[in-house]
Regions:
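C-terminal alpha-helix
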Residues: 143-151
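Unchanged
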Residues: 48-139
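N-terminal strand-loop-strand
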Residues: 2-43
């Protein structure tokens, strides 16, 4: 009987739930990924660079994809999933962090990022579970909401 080796490429990414208070409510920076239908909202995230720490990746990707700078508050957790890319199965781990807005104007991003991001918008954190397209990201937003309810920021 032949023996087959099942191998899977692994990817490690990091992203952020970047929050701020506007008019008395917590809002988060959401992106509409390039090429997706209107109404598909996601969190900024991307591959961890060689020698880069996941928290630094979350801050960098948030700035690249939204135009804002933030500070790291806490790690929210990891999501894991498998997807297929060009016929190859990929096991992906995405570490998410709670980030606090510090400066910048949402949506002011470099022209080359327009391929990846069609739009960035502040959306109510309370509504994140209804607005975000991906289940794991909804869970991270729920953790962010629980954190801001239980802690003084």
């Amino acid at each position: 009987m032949p023996c087959y080796k099942l191998s899977m490429r692994r990817e490690f990414s990091a992203g952020g739930v970047a929050i701020r208070r506007l008019r008395g409510e917590w809002v988060f920076a959401a992106i509409r990924p390039g090429g997706k239908e209107p109404g598909v909202w996601a969190l900024p995230k991307g591959l961890i660079g060689e020698g880069e720490k996941p928290g630094a990746t979350a801050l960098r990707e948030t700035e690249e994809e939204t135009g804002i700078q933030a500070t790291l508050v806490t790690k929210l957790g990891d999501i894991r999933y498998v997807y297929t890319w060009e016929g190859e199965r990929v096991f992906k781990v995405v570490s998410f962090y709670l980030l606090r807005y510090s400066k910048g104007r949402l949506g002011e991003i470099e022209p080359e990022m327009r391929i990846e991001v069609d739009e960035a918008r502040w959306l109510p954190l309370e509504e994140a579970p209804k607005l975000l397209a991906y289940g794991g990201e909804r869970q991270m937003a729920e953790k962010a909401l629980a954190f801001v309810r239980d802690n003084v920021l």
